[in-house]
A protein has these predicted regions:
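Class I S-adenosyl-L-methionine-dependent methyltransferase module
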Residues: 1-129
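Conserved proline-anchored active-site loop of SAM-dependent methyltransferases
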Residues: 1-6, 12, 85-92, 138-139, ...
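Conserved SAM-binding strand-loop segment of SAM-dependent methyltransferases
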Residues: 22-23, 133-138
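Mobile active-site "lid"/loop adjacent to the S-adenosyl-L-methionine
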Residues: 100, 104-111, 160-180
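A structural motif corresponding to the C-terminal end of an alpha-helix
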Residues: 120-134, 183-196
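Short, conserved active-site loop motifs that form the nucleotide-linked donor/cofactor pocket
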Residues: 132-133, 152, 221
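Short conserved loop adjoining the S-adenosyl-L-methionine
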Residues: 143-148
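Long, positively charged, glycine-interspersed low-complexity recognition regions
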Residues: 161, 170, 175-253
Length: 253
């Protein structure tokens, strides 16, 4: 498992290192310390909030205090990454973003550490402890095909070139990298290695022509259109007619 964001891999390693129930206890302790909501226990009415509008108003003060203390920490130790993960749970759309000063700078989101999120963490923390899973934070262009075969599968989930997601601000992912990733997958295909690529073909009036032309040049690749509902996300488009076309592209049935 590889991610270019070293913070993500550090959190994964933390989840591998600590017993699952201890992870949950530490997160609960941070939530309690900063006075963040616990809708799993208390429900929404306790915080004078409705599910549709979310918990952002209630959590804003505690969230900002947690974020400020995290950004002032000198050591990036286990405590830092548990606090960072808790921020992500309460952040806008559960995303991660740092500014040029390496400060986490996302605003508070609508949700908290509810039952759904808690179960996801529990299941992931158990799965990541599998000793066969290797963790790395390398440039994808430097990941060799050594050891991979026709029984292997490469799953690529890059930042989406034509969206304005927080993880792709400041031109973190560009056309050159998009082309290099597609060329990397072509080389994998030439070696008989299976791949699956998550991406966006259209987003409103924008089209990922690099991806479209790549599919046209490679008719053997299979496009699977995905239909996701992001009704619980913190961001809602004003013009819902301008939808996004998300796809999974594979070189196998």
């Amino acid at each position: 498992m590889n991610d270019s964001d070293k913070n993500v891999i550090r959190i994964f390693r933390l989840f591998r290192q600590y017993p699952t129930e201890q992870i949950l206890e530490i997160i609960d302790g941070i939530i309690d310390r900063y006075g963040l909501s616990d809708s799993r226990t208390n429900g929404y009415a306790f915080y004078q909030c409705e599910s549709a509008r979310g918990l952002g108003t209630y959590n804003k003060e505690g969230y900002n205090r947690l974020r400020s203390e995290l950004n002032n920490m000198k050591r990036r130790n286990d405590r830092y990454f548990f606090m960072l993960f808790t921020l992500i749970v309460f952040a806008f759309n559960n995303q991660i973003r740092f500014n040029e000063k390496r400060e986490f700078n996302l605003p508070v989101g609508k949700r908290d550490f509810n039952n759904n999120m808690r179960n996801k963490v529990r299941h992931f923390a158990e799965a990541i402890k599998n000793p066969h899973i290797e963790l790395s934070s390398n440039d994808f262009r430097r990941i060799p095909f050594d050891g991979l075969s026709e029984h292997s599968l490469i799953y690529a989930d890059p930042p989406y070139l034509i969206t304005c997601a927080t993880y792709n601000e400041n031109n973190g992912w560009n056309a050159r990298l998009e082309k290099q990733l597609l060329a990397y997958l072509d080389r994998a295909n030439d070696r008989g290695i299976k791949f699956a690529l998550s991406n966006v073909l259209k987003n409103g009036d924008k089209e990922n022509t690099i991806l479209t032309e790549w599919l046209e040049r490679n008719p053997m690749y299979i496009r699977h259109d995905l239909n996701y509902n992001y009704s619980n996300s913190s961001y809602h488009k004003k013009d819902r007619s301008k939808h996004s076309t998300e796809v999974l592209i594979t070189n196998f049935e």
